Amino acid sequence: MTLHSSIDRVTDRIRERSRNTRDSYLKKIARAAEDGPRRAHLSCGNQAHAYAAMDDKDDMATTRKPNIGIVTAYNDMLSAHQPYERFPDLIRRAGHAAGATVQVAGGVPAMCDGVTQGRPGMELSLFSRDVIALAAGVALSHDCFDSALYLGVCDKIVPGLVIAAATFGHVPAVFIPAGPMPSGLPNDEKSKVRQQFAAGEVGRDALMAAEMASYHSPGTCTFYGTANSNQMLMEFMGLHLPGSSFVNPNTPLREALTVAGVERAAAITRLGNDYLPAGDVLDEKAFVNGIVGLMATGGSTNLVMHLPAMARAAGVLLDIEDFHDISESVPLMARVYPNGLADVNHFHAAGGLGYMIGQLLEAGLMHQDVKTINGTGMDGYTAEPRLDGERIRWEAGSTDTLNDRILRPVSDPFARTGGLKQLDGNLGRGVIKISAVAEERHVIEAKARIFSDQEQVKTAFRAGEFTEDTIVVVRFQGPRANGMPELHSLTPTLAVLQDRGLKVALVTDGRMSGASGKVPAAIHISPEASTGGPLARVRDGDLIRLDATMGTIDCLAEDFDTRKPVAFDPASSSEGMGREMFAAFRAVAGPATEGAGVVV
């Protein structure tokens, strides 16, 4: 199928924009790879230190068996990462069977936004991505590994690991998922209880019972937020094995897929005939495919910020216009909560990513001719994994959706576009996701209420101060102000106001993830207020027009452009809960439109 003209045009634009940086990157990883397998160049003393604790130290010192390094984000506080506790032993056995040796190269931190929502710790969340990249870099700096396995699932973890994999782009990389937890209390019922609690209609006991019934076992949360968007992304970009993203933890199929991933990691090293450095996988076509998947599934807006940072590590320069243009061409094919009632388990059962990839390829909406760890182009990702004894056999996936209330073909989508819009105006540049927003709320013109943090919004709500249509402006939430925390805890409050018949919207230089749903939210506004950006000039009562249809965001006050910006006071977010240690990160973080990066 001929590539869609818009996808072709955006890819060419990215390629041209990235010509110099990508060329420099490819030369860098070629230099790193040219002297062959890494550990052969270590001195005997260096090697003895590296192998001292290993049972197979003789193999490591005297043979040419590939040595696989594991970079793991295991902890048992994150339900999505708890299954990784068992993975190193399984990977060692699989590696030995495949003629390789295996070492845990190092661990990286992994924090849960679901735990830190609305708390001071959330101000460390975005920067944890860069810490993860740095920690993975330290793990790989021993220069002992012929390929690397990356164990990570959730919000900042996968982007941080991809940044590291790209930086060590001469080392082949395989990402190993852990899978979503089985379905619990339906997400829409959980959301309803949250809104009832916010409105004072139920007590904390009912809220706690609903939350525990929803988040109830090992595995990723089942709504389609950033964590599950990450898993989709790794499959669409060819870093997972086909059909592996949404298989539940602790099942025979999950274990067999992990074994198969180890076998691929052993097969694609420079020691064999199928050398596949990570940097060759992570090209402009792979990133375009990732954006296509984000739009077709209605994925998290956090990836609009993470993908530019990930791409930059591989010498590829993305802009939010790329997301906008791809969104305009790629239809919304899935309804997964918060865009629908289904969860990721239902999506997977309906045909999942394999069906979707097949449809997009047939329509020319994604690149087929890419390098993947599967050893094929993207057509190999239309297959489904099946157990054949204890091993994996891939067979042709369904060419028909198995539930058209959850998953639809390109020819009959839920919406013509992916629902992500670029916003531009005198308030700056940002994005809005409208796939779950009712059409009558795509344009809102209302007076502004100005807040400097989300707790102020909740206090005003409890005081009954919202009695008319309102644009809620929460500023000083950018990366240089306070680390750009997730503002998802505002969702129940704003949803209650909307359900009362008010037109409300959020405008912020902070984040509001893809789990946020039906309230219009203009997010990632840049330049951010703390650097003198336009949001710092907005006043209470100003008329603001948010027009997702035209892609504009403007303050209509006549004197707006001549006002002096309000100064940012960092006192409330400069210390406590480790925030003082991240002052250096806040000082140098890039703009959200470029990924809010520190190390890239």
Q: Model-predicted segments: where are they?
A:
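Catalytic or ion-coupling anion/metal-binding cores of large enzyme and transporter domains
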Residues: 1-76, 80, 89-108, 120-121, ...
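N-terminal small/polar loop signature for handling phosphorylated ligands or for N-terminal nucleophile
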Residues: 105-143
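Contiguous domain-boundary segments centered on the initiation and propagation of an alpha-helix
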Residues: 129-136, 141-148, 458-466, 471
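Glycine-/small-residue-enriched capping loops at alpha/beta junctions
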Residues: 83
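Acidic/charged coordination and interface sites in well-structured regions
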Residues: 86
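A short, small-residue-rich loop immediately preceding and capping a beta-strand
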Residues: 140-161, 172-176
